């Protein structure tokens, strides 16, 4: 029987089982507590998370996976990579949060998606004039903190190549990888400090960048980087961790470098099986427990996979692992008391995945299986048999409808639709609008909570929602917005709201995961076939419409976003699930336009998230994702204007796909990126209309009228005003009313000033 290290967790959630970190951060930002309370709660969370893993028998437990905001931001702080505009902030806590969130006078650093997940990281801003230097306090302190509880952790670090590749240059023309000679000495110094901590220390370098299509030059830098780092100290055991796809090129590059191990994802990167003979005796951190989805592991399938791995890797060199950090899944099923018991039995959250690792280690490493161990396998397989036979999963009516789809696209070219829409809508040049949601006040959250818990009646709830809509419509009219929204007070989440009204979805009580900073989301769970039993948004939109003579947008979430922001069933192709959702959204659009709604927004905020990281897999995704969106809007008449919204995206590589989606208006997030994103549309000759977000809603900072006028003028240098809409860069639900009153008012004033100037020029 093998008795060595057998189990490994890439990283653990940090927001807290009851969102303790979120709550204390927001109290601190509201100046209702001191940093010492954050520090105390953070220490308690780290201790709890370490002990969970220790109790589950995990061999490799992490330190420095914890962060108060984001690990990429932590790494920038570690390297003293602080942009010049923050140089006057000397308090380290104030500096940290200013870089992430901005201040009244300073724009925050850019934020974007972490690969193809719904987690967002802060994008470091680098230049060759930066004085990089090491600040290792957090890393060293957390390692020592864990030792106080009897734990010798592996230390998690963002690897140099990933850090540089995901950073952006202050000078837009610079290649950030050219800065490797400047930051590598900081990493070397860090490793020397770590080597002094113990006679043997394990260090995990997260290098997910190598699962993308990287060029030969980057691979060479990757090789040189780890060749140098591996020679710092014989006390260190270096592990290069990859995840989200295969890393076959990197495995070959690392073949002759004396590192301890390589982490490979065998759930989303099965091609990794092809290069196991290149490990050369290194430990294989085998990612076999899905760190991105919430379904129970099929032990039989995983054991079969491990037997395949064992053909090329000695059993004693295999360590069973999660595919990636468990940051992407909720904490524990123990908090879920209202889930259907069958569906709950099919699930596994972070703490349950620890137990799955322990189970698989027993099944794989123990050669003479006892009755107890065999029972573990049998119980697991029984659950999968029951799921396969469950009537809760398949709806024959849905299957028949999908099989008989005849209409997949709407009528008319964009030019035909645009002409009809301009006549019907009669909007001014540079029309102003918002993305949809307005601030979710404590009062409105309490209203929803009380209704859900049967504390108030349906009439009381409806009255509260209508009062909010009344105020929201009145506010928008007062400041002069051109196209209004109802504010979405009835919606806790843009996906959950629709999931609650569609069949095939289930919801957790406490399934929160971190999206960015203190922002948490509670993804819906798709477990079965999807359909729409009845209209989902008609009543609230029609009520809002009755309160104004202006146009009110219908607000829907698109099928691809609903899919990508949900935990999707694992027994059906994602494309087939998306098609089912698209049919449900199509029915809703049809009902909305019949009710007189002239503009309908179908948000595809998460469209880019679903993109595979490897080019060879992209065409397949684009094909079914575009088809699903077009199927969803195929019921829209020519004169019905379809808007869509996309978040945090680099559009260079998907502009052709956006063209195929053919939305009449697309709103995008550009406020932290200047005109860089917009230029892509201009260069391409994009014909449809665009609403580039002109201010950053993720920061509490209120932009001035003059600043916004300048942004609009800059937009018009790239695209003609006839194609432009003026709007914030995202929904406003996370902001406070006091913030948005001024921001939106300034935005409208800026648009009106520019519009007036254009009209004067036109009549000269």
UniProtKB/Swiss-Prot annotation:
5-methyltetrahydropteroyltri-L-glutamate binds at residues 19-22, 113, 519-520, 565, 609. L-methionine binds at residues 435-437, 488, 603. Pathway: Amino-acid biosynthesis; L-methionine biosynthesis via de novo pathway; L-methionine from L-homocysteine (MetE route): step 1/1. One of its GO terms (biological process) is methylation. Binds 1 zinc ion per subunit. It catalyses: 5-methyltetrahydropteroyltri-L-glutamate + L-homocysteine = tetrahydropteroyltri-L-glutamate + L-methionine. Its cofactor is Zn(2+). Gene3D superfamilies: 3.20.20.210. The active site is at 698 (proton donor). InterPro entries: Cbl-indep_Met_Synth_N, Cobalamin-indep_Met_synthase, Met_Synth_C/arc, UROD/MetE-like_sf. Catalyzes the transfer of a methyl group from 5-methyltetrahydrofolate to homocysteine resulting in methionine formation. Belongs to the vitamin-B12 independent methionine synthase family. This is 5-methyltetrahydropteroyltriglutamate--homocysteine methyltransferase. It comes from Desulforamulus reducens (strain ATCC BAA-1160 / DSM 100696 / MI-1) (Desulfotomaculum reducens).
